[in-house]
């Protein structure tokens, strides 16, 4: 049975150290322990945090973990899982907010850098549409499918419905490949071709279809695949 954190010397307690010296003084396990708040009868919060990080392969693995895996992890439960998921989502939204101040999508790198923290790590394919104004600035975005373009029933209508509603000038499609390989599949190419035809009919430009892999991406526009 692990020693309770409250019985540790004050200089070893993560919460007290955070308040006294700032969050940058804590390692990932200690920061995680502060979020957890408490442990189990068998282990304290710090030991539980270390087990979480070890099991899921560090911070990167923890960010990528499916919510159901987290909720079913021994010692976590619904309340602790909710705290962790909320903290991870706040971090993602921070990246969104800081990125939106600079978001003129002038090249594929801009799209990749914006979306890599949103969908690049997901274990399931997610199809995202970015809606742009005439200056190529973000005016909206939408996740139109989870599961991928080849088996989630995504249609060109799903891509352009919101674009028409908000008066978008152009759209960029993006989706991730959980395998880490961003090479477009035949389904990706066929789907993009259908969307391109619909864009010409509607008068809304399709600027690109970006496929995100593990720390890399492919621009279907740059590859002249549509």
Swiss-Prot record:
Pfam families noted in UniProt: RadC, UPF0758_N
Domain MPN: residue ranges: 104-226
Cited InterPro entries: MPN, RadC_JAB, RuvA_2-like, UPF0758, UPF0758_CS, UPF0758_N
Single GO biological process annotation from the record: proteolysis
Keywords per UniProt: Hydrolase, Metal-binding, Metalloprotease, Protease, Zinc
Motif position, JAMM motif: 175-188
Binding residues annotated for Zn(2+), in chain numbering: 175, 177, 188
Single GO molecular function: metal ion binding
CDD domains referenced in this protein's UniProt entry, alphabetically: MPN_DUF2466 (cd08071)
PANTHER family in UniProt: DNA REPAIR PROTEIN RADC, UPF0758 PROTEIN YEES-RELATED
NCBIfam families per record: PRK00024.1, radc
Similarity field: Belongs to the UPF0758 family.
Name of protein: UPF0758 protein CHY_0341
The species this protein was found in: Carboxydothermus hydrogenoformans (strain ATCC BAA-161 / DSM 6008 / Z-2901)
């Amino acid at each position: 049975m692990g020693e309770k954190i409250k019985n540790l010397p004050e200089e070893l307690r993560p919460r007290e150290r955070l308040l006294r010296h700032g969050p940058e003084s804590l390692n990932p396990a200690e920061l995680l322990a502060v979020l957890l708040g408490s442990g189990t009868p068998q282990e304290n919060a710090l030991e539980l945090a270390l087990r979480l990080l070890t099991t899921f392969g560090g911070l990167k693995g923890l960010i990528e973990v499916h919510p159901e895996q987290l909720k079913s992890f021994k010692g976590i439960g619904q309340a602790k899982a909710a705290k962790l998921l909320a903290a991870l989502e706040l971090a993602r939204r921070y990246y969104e907010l800081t990125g939106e101040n600079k978001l003129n999508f002038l090249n594929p790198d801009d799209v990749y850098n914006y979306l890599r923290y949103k969908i690049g790590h997901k274990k399931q394919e997610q199809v995202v549409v970015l809606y742009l104004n005439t200056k190529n600035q973000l005016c909206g975005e939408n996740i139109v499918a989870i599961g991928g373009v080849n088996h989630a029933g995504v249609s060109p209508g799903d891509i352009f419905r919101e674009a028409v509603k908000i008066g978008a000038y152009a759209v960029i499609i993006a989706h991730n490949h959980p395998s880490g390989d961003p090479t477009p599949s035949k389904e990706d190419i066929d789907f993009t071709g259908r969307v391109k035809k619909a864009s010409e009919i509607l008068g809304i430009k399709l600027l690109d279809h970006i496929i995100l892999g593990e720390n890399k991406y492919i621009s279907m526009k740059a590859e002249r695949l549509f």
